[in-house]
Each structure stands twice: as C-alpha cells, then as structure tokens.
Curated annotation (Swiss-Prot):
Pfam families for this protein: TCP
Region entry Disordered, spans: 34-68, 142-161, 258-282, 295-336, 387-448
Organism: Oryza sativa subsp. japonica (Rice)
Gene: PCF3
Family matches, as InterPro entries: TF_TCP_subgr, Transcription_factor_TCP
Protein name: Transcription factor PCF3
PANTHER family: TRANSCRIPTION FACTOR PCF3, TRANSCRIPTION FACTOR TCP4-RELATED
Length: 448
C-alpha cells in the first residue's frame, strides 16, 4: 500500500500541467484512501466499469476548462482505484475545489486537506443524514412521555370556608362527604364546622385557646350562616370552664359551690348590640348569654337540695330585715368596735356575737340581742367606711350576707360557717351554747 501511494505522488509531480485545485480535490476527497483499499482488495475490481467513472469525469471537467483533458485523466485514474466508495466523496471533492485555496506545496496539502475536508465536506453530510434519525427518536421519547404523564386532576378536594379554599387529602375529603350525607348538612363547610364544635374540648386542651377567633368582624358571614343552622350549642364547651372559675372564687371566699346562685346573672343592658358592619356578632353573643342563663336554671333544677337551702336562706334574710330595729339605735353601734383591732375580715366572717378569747368579750356578751344580729351592714355608716377601706367590695358584700344568714340560721349554719374558718371543736361547742343563749335572749326581746 505504501508503494502505491508513493507511485501516485511521483506521478503527480511529473504532470505539472494538472491544476493544483483539481488534484487536491481528488486526493482530499479520498483518493489516497481509495487507493489503499484497492491495493488490499485486489486488481479484479479495477476491470469492471461503473457509473461513478462518468460522474467523476463530469465533475472534474466542470472544474477546469482550459485543462479538461488532464483533469479528466487524473479523475479517471483516481476513480479506477476508488469506485467502490460512496458518491458523496466526489461531491465533497467538487466543493473543496471551489472553496479551498491552493496550498504552497503538495506535501503540505496532503497533511492538512484530508483533516479539513473530512469534517467540512463529508462530516456535514453525515450530520445532515443523521439529523432525521435523532429527531424521530426525540419524537418517540416525547410520545412515550406523554403516555406516562400523570393526570391533571387534583388529588386534593377543594372545600369552601372563610373566603378561601381548603386543600385536604382525598381520603379525608371522602369521609367529609360521607358525613355530610349522613348528617343531612347542605355543605361540606357545615360538616367541618360541626366537627370543630365536637372537638372543641380537645382543641382547647391541645392549644389552650380554642378555635374561636378574637376578631368577630372578620367572621360576619360565617357567624350569620352558622347561627341559622347550628346543630349544637356553640358555647357548650365553655360551660365547664365558667363553672370552674365560679367554683374557684367560691372556695377562695369560704362558701360552697351552691352559693353561686347568689351571684346575679349578667344584666340585659350588657348584651352587645349588633353593629351595621357586623350583624352576626351581636346575635352570637346574645345566644351565648342566653345559654349561660339556661345553664344556671338547669343547675338549680338538678340540685333541689341546694335550691331549697337557698330559698330558706332568702326567707330567713327577709324575716331578719322585717324584724330589724331602726339603724339609729345607739346600742347597736358597738358592733363595729372590733374594727379598731385591725381584724376587719375576721369580724365579718364571724357572727355578731363575741367570744371569750376576743377583746372586750365580757361586756359584749351581756348586751348583744338576737334582733341586732340580723341588721344589714349597709345600715351602719361606719360599716360602709370599713367596706370602702377594703379593696374587695363585692367579696365583703357576699361575706356580710353570709354572716347575717349564719347568725339567723341557728347552730347548724353557724357550725357550717365556722368549719370554713378553721375553728377548733372546743370553740364550736362554745358557739353552740352562745347560740342557744342568743336565741333565748332573742325570744325574751321579742316577747317584751
């Protein structure tokens, strides 16, 4: 093969009349490669003529006009050794002859031209031929991807609420739909509201605040719709909290929980009035106050013993007010004397009679009369001053009422009250004897 290449080069040097661009096109288009392949394949293929010979002859004649015979001979010699190659090599040879400049020497062209001609001429056509294949493969991939694309339907279900949509999993939404049908609700939002009402105690236990927002003006529409078809009392989860607060106050003041009936219910004038921009908030608050009033009524019906006790106490208080003498009696003014010792709260927690261990007990025990014990504390100007001096006015009012009731209720009420005050059994026995003496003195005073 090397020998054939050298022979071709020497033949080209001996023919100076051959134009360099034509020779360069023949050599750069694959003439050397074709000669090497022909030397390896044998000489039997050179005898058979082919149509490529005429094609290469026509291309080389169009390239050179004044050297047509020499160019045709060179092209024929190259085609006889390379007729088995693809025709695009010769098309590249024609393009290279028109565009490539003539090199300075023939040996330099052998080193540079094949490397430039192969990517420039043949490479471009190979890429062009491979382009449709790549595009078809891309279309096939896109078609396969389109077949495997996930559906555009949202897996979450949209539920109405507070002017926006709530996104929830499909399983949760299915359960909400089923519950809506079973409860007979009109919308899924109503069902979710019902679920929140049922779970309010657990929500309060978990968060400490609950789900009732502080800004009612932002929930006018929701409250209005909820008030029309509420299936359960809205304030019911908070009833136990209100009762707990009342019980704590009662325990702090020293009397039982049934005395919360003495506390007045909220007056009607404190009910909030609906505003034009928030018509649902006022209705909601009025409903809560009505439910609170119903709660007190239910408690009084469920506890008949406590109710009877409260009625008895009210009757005793009315009888005490009727039997009380005018407040201008100078003999009754001594009752506020123990206030000078600094025991204001202890004085009103205890009945009006004196004890042997108290200050001035000897003189006070002989002069106290039973009717004076029923006198209301508000009748004494000095007692009012004591009340104003104290910070807890409402607590003192309740304590004063309890003191008067315990004084008129006999030994049982006095014993019950002094058990809360932490007295010893000996003091309680002495109190019973004093109660008996006070009752006899009261009977004598009433007979006189």
């Amino acid at each position: 093969m090397i020998k054939d290449l050298r022979t071709l080069e020497s033949w080209a040097k001996e023919k100076p009349e051959i134009e360099q661009p034509a020779l360069q096109a023949v050599v750069g288009g694959g003439g050397l490669r074709a000669a090497a392949a022909a030397a390896e394949g044998g000489m039997e293929q050179q005898a058979a003529p082919s149509s490529s010979t005429s094609t290469s002859t026509n291309s080389s004649r169009s390239t050179s006009d004044h050297h047509a015979a020499a160019a045709a001979a060179a092209a024929a010699a190259a085609a006889q050794v390379a007729h088995q190659h693809h025709p695009f090599y010769y098309a590249a040879a024609q393009g290279g002859a028109n565009t490539m400049p003539a090199p300075a020497s023939f040996m330099g062209s052998l080193a540079i031209v094949p490397a430039a001609a192969a990517p420039g001429g043949g490479g471009g056509q190979v890429q062009a031929a491979a382009a449709p294949v790549a595009s078809s493969e891309k279309k096939a991939v896109v078609a396969a991807g389109a077949g495997a694309k996930r559906p555009t339907k949202d897996r979450h279900t949209k539920v109405e609420g507070r002017g926006r949509r709530i996104r929830m999993p499909a399983l949760c939404a299915a359960r909400v739909f089923q519950l809506t049908r079973e409860l007979g609700h009109k919308t899924d939002g109503e069902t979710i509201e019902w679920l929140l009402q049922q779970a309010e105690p657990a929500i309060v236990a978990a968060t400490g605040t609950g789900t009732i927002p502080a800004n009612f003006s932002s929930l006018a529409v929701s409250l209005r719709s909820a008030a029309s078809h509420s299936s359960s009392p809205r304030a019911a989860p908070f009833h136990h909290l209100q009762q707990q607060q009342q019980h704590d106050v009662a325990a702090m003041l020293g009397f039982h929980h049934h005395h919360h009936q003495l506390l007045p219910p909220p007056p009607p004038h404190q009910h909030p009035e609906p505003t034009p921009q928030d018509p649902g908030a006022g209705e909601f608050m009025r409903k809560r106050y009505r439910e609170a009033d119903d709660l007190f009524k239910d408690t009084s019906r469920q506890d008949p013993v406590d109710g009877a006790t409260g009625e008895a106490e009210q009757k005793a208080r009315a009888a005490a007010a009727a039997a009380a003498p005018p407040p201008t009696a100078p003999s009754a003014m001594w009752a506020v004397g123990p206030n000078t010792t600094g025991a204001t709260a202890a004085f009103w927690m205890q009945p009006a009679w004196a004890f042997p261990h108290g200050a001035g007990a000897g003189a006070a025990g002989n002069t106290v009369q039973a009717p004076l014990q029923f006198m209301s504390r508000s009748s004494f100007p000095t007692a009012m001053n004591v009340t104003m001096a104290d910070n807890n006015n409402s607590s003192n009012n309740n304590l004063g009422m309890l003191a008067a009731l315990n004084a008129g209720g006999g030994g049982r009420s006095g014993e019950h009250q002094h058990q809360h005050e932490g007295q010893s059994p000996a003091e309680m026995d002495h109190q019973r004897r004093a109660n008996g003496g006070g009752g006899e003195a009261g009977g004598a005073a009433s007979s006189q």
